Each structure stands twice: as C-alpha cells, then as structure tokens.
C-alpha cells in the first residue's frame, strides 16, 4: 500500500506545499507545488488529491489536516522563524527554502 508525505518550500512571501508518494523509503513527486497565500493552496491540494481516486479518504484527510497545521504555523509567524524550527515542529514534512 502506498504511503504519502508532504513536502514544503519555506519562502519569504509564500509557502509551497506538495505531496510525494513514498515507496520503499523512496520519494516520488505525486503533485506539483501549491502556493499559499498567493493561491488557495489548501483548496487546490484538496482538489488534486480528490482527482486521484486511488488515494483513500483516510490518507486524503490526513494529508489535508497536516497541510492545515503547516499553513497555520507559517501564517501565525512561523514564516519569520528559521526553517530548522519549522522542521523541528513538523519532522514528518520535508521542508526546504531560503530562510
């Protein structure tokens, strides 16, 4: 059964979120990046995951809930904190960027 993992780009003015499929510890991109607040990343991610009917509802909800937590953290001041702090807060999400 496939597993899924979020990844994020921590940018100065945006947070970009994407999903990878994880098979045998190897990650393969499943979606492109969705940007917040430039676009409604959460709604776009939801629509993308729903279009992939082979992803279970449980997995979709889990990914969207975790994306919500990440967006809220970034929005509530996390964007001004070092990436290392975000990575410590969200160890299950691969985070990269320029801060």
UniProtKB/Swiss-Prot annotation:
The keyword Membrane does not apply. The keyword Ribonucleoprotein applies. Transmembrane segments: none annotated. It comes from the Bacteria. Keywords: Ribonucleoprotein, Ribosomal protein. One of its GO terms (molecular function) is structural constituent of ribosome. Pfam families: PSRP-3_Ycf65. GO terms for cellular component: ribonucleoprotein complex; ribosome. One of its GO terms (biological process) is translation. Probably a ribosomal protein or a ribosome-associated protein. Belongs to the chloroplast-specific ribosomal protein cS23 family. Part of the 30S ribosomal subunit. PANTHER family: 30S RIBOSOMAL PROTEIN 3, CHLOROPLASTIC, OS04G0461100 PROTEIN. This is Probable small ribosomal subunit protein cS23. It comes from Synechococcus sp. (strain JA-2-3B'a(2-13)).
């Amino acid at each position: 059964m496939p597993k899924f993992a979020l990844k994020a780009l921590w940018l100065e003015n945006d947070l970009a979120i994407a999903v990878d499929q994880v098979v045998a510890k190897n990650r393969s991109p499943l979606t492109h990046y969705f940007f917040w607040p430039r676009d409604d990343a959460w709604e776009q991610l939801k629509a993308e995951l729903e279009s992939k009917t082979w992803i279970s509802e449980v997995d979709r909800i889990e990914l969207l809930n975790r994306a919500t937590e990440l967006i809220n953290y970034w929005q509530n001041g996390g964007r001004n904190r070092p990436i290392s702090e975000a990575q410590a807060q969200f160890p299950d999400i691969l985070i990269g960027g320029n801060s």
